[in-house]
């Protein structure tokens, strides 16, 4: 039987910080593909609370015991990064209609830039459908309890950064 | 190196008739997964123009020269069919917001019925974003030209059924 | 100066019955174009409360004193009707997102059938944003007051048909 | 202190059958209002699996131990029913965008019929965001497991009706 | 008869400035609940044209003759403010789909922070469906007429601030 | 025959830079109206990559050989500009749902400011449905190929500004 080439998907994002919604998507990703590369975006128009190194380091600790998950970082165009990686699939999460439209636009532009890279959408668990990095930062900065909304491995450092001295 | 298990996705639908939009999704599917099973739904609340046998036969002729594509049919719950197939992924196409909501509801129900089956969405080519089996039937029945909207292998029989004697 | 060709737009619909929302769109249409042809659809999958003749007759009485408005009927494909009319514009009303998606699909298919016919969308007055022929029939049949929701010229006959003997 | 008039809300629906999503909305309703009247719609264009009497009886058993909840039935226009009830609020559930548009249209028409009746929307628990009576019937009829999707008091009779002899 | 506890709803917002849309929502709120607390948000990421004191003062003057309406201000998390107020209901206005998604996300996060606080949505009058504080500021700053878009009690000071010397 | 007054539409935008999507809309505009005025917005909250003069100059070169197209610029309110122009129609492009809502709000506000100015929406070609000035700038700045996404007359200067020295 011809040797089966593993399917690798890139899961790109700013991950500022990494949330339980992101984590649930990666878990569904490794049930769908052989390998998922969590690709942390370096250049982003958003001013982030955590540096690129910190965001990469947090992701590595979260997936320490998941051999199907790799963590990397990239700058510039996502499509250029995927082209020089072993992947030919971009994996994105869908939560609601407004996600859909933005993702649709990005996926069609990426397809124009490289028609051989497929964008595939997975749905977050409904438990995390309202969750985003920005709403977590908003709640934490205003004294709200974000326990359980970020993976436990990074909870303390996220609180320390967002609510110094808490 | 541990033997890599091929990734198989089920692409379910009524396919009454099969459109160029469906075809473009399957082509993107086999660039993403090792194998795609086109699963033609037997039991459907819609009264179809083509019988189940005809719809299965048309799909088989369309993908005759595509070894990565299998054609099958199923009755009852999609999730039950996938459970006894080699696949653990359901592949669906997304065209617009209204698709999104219906698909979201179905995917969450399927996930409740079997949390190990992942629903994955791909986007049709923008050329076919307006295309659906029902709009093709509507146009053909009213004397419109549907050339190029269904795969050429089945154009004559689709016209013959929708516009007898044309 | 070269002679200016008047711009004519076709405003197609089932108009079962004609509503104040339809009327407000036609009024905005004749402020935009030189002439508007209200084209009443003969063949429709919906079973209508009023026959084609009745719907055409009602529209004619409503626009009796509006020289910029013509009333006609058509069967089969809208695009075929427009092609043999003096118009090259199809005028449609937009009320909400779900309208938008259906209209988007129809407009792209019509554009595929004849790229020289432009579909143009106008917005109903916000007063009529919730109004549709079907919600009017629903309310009237259940004894609700639809005064002011259909043009006064046709109020009596609409009530007589929907709530016989009222 | 002037005597406080209790706030009563009418929660209308076909409830064919009553789902856990409906139940979670009523529970949130009685935390918001003093009393909730579950008003089962008699006249409906949908052909129901359960008669009006059966649907009323099921709702009564579900809320047997909830003094803040009353069960009633109505025919004709919802607004006319609310006008002769102690309520001046209509309570509706929102799950997703497509709900939103339909509800928006109904609420604006109801407001036109009686500006003193307020329509108020509550959000279902995210656990039930994909749930509807029709998707439950669809799954059950096709042999799927709907345990936990309808209140336990009515599970047996719902299964018996949808999958006779199971 | 057991003493009826009045239902109080908190209507939070930046109100920069207060609009006729906001006013119409509060009017519908006091037809639904016994008391509405207009809670002006202190901490906001948006840089406001009016200080917190000015926004609170304007709201107080607008509702001077409405005993069912109280005006207050809050900082930090809305849920924390509601918890120490007599209210257990958050009242929000819905205008269109994009509102819906943002509100949905906020309401689900608030529910996670305190499951006993219910978020309830009312619909603005269709007259104000296009109105927002930002579009009013945009129009006024560019010399447009905003008469009738803000309550008359605050029109002069809003114009004076947005178009000094007009 | 009474002399026919030509129909002129204003097509307003920031055009930073002008895209093939904008171009395709203007081409459909001159098939619908006698004349289209491309009105480049001076005052805009967005910080643009090209000055107003550069944006006007680029548009003029693009439509050099199109006598039905005029290029102008305006400051302040669009409605005020249209009122002193020969046009009584504002022409806007619709790509997706999120466009729709923003456009809906703007059109209703413009209608409030001047009920005699009609806003009319045309749909971009599906080829450009994902295209916007901002996504083009984003891709170009990150080294992506934007050939064919802006009219060829302005490609070199757009690249020179976005990727100096390329």
From Swiss-Prot, chains A, B, C, D, E, F:
Taxonomic lineage from the root: Bacteria, Pseudomonadati, Thermodesulfobacteriota, Desulfovibrionia, Desulfovibrionales
Positions bound to substrate: 14, 46, 78, 92
Species of origin: Maridesulfovibrio salexigens (strain ATCC 14822 / DSM 2638 / NCIMB 8403 / VKM B-1763)
Function: Reversibly transfers an adenylyl group from ATP to 4'-phosphopantetheine, yielding dephospho-CoA (dPCoA) and pyrophosphate.
Record pathway: Cofactor biosynthesis; coenzyme A biosynthesis; CoA from (R)-pantothenate: step 4/5
Keywords, ordered alphabetically: ATP-binding, Coenzyme A biosynthesis, Cytoplasm, Magnesium, Nucleotide-binding, Nucleotidyltransferase, Transferase
Cofactor(s) it depends on: Mg(2+)
Subunit structure: Homohexamer.
Site (Transition state stabilizer) residue list: 22
One cellular component (GO) term of this entry: cytoplasm
EC number: 2.7.7.3
PANTHER family: PHOSPHOPANTETHEINE ADENYLYLTRANSFERASE (PTHR21342:SF1)
Subcellular localization: Cytoplasm
Protein name: Phosphopantetheine adenylyltransferase
Family: Belongs to the bacterial CoaD family.
SUPFAM superfamilies: Nucleotidylyl transferase
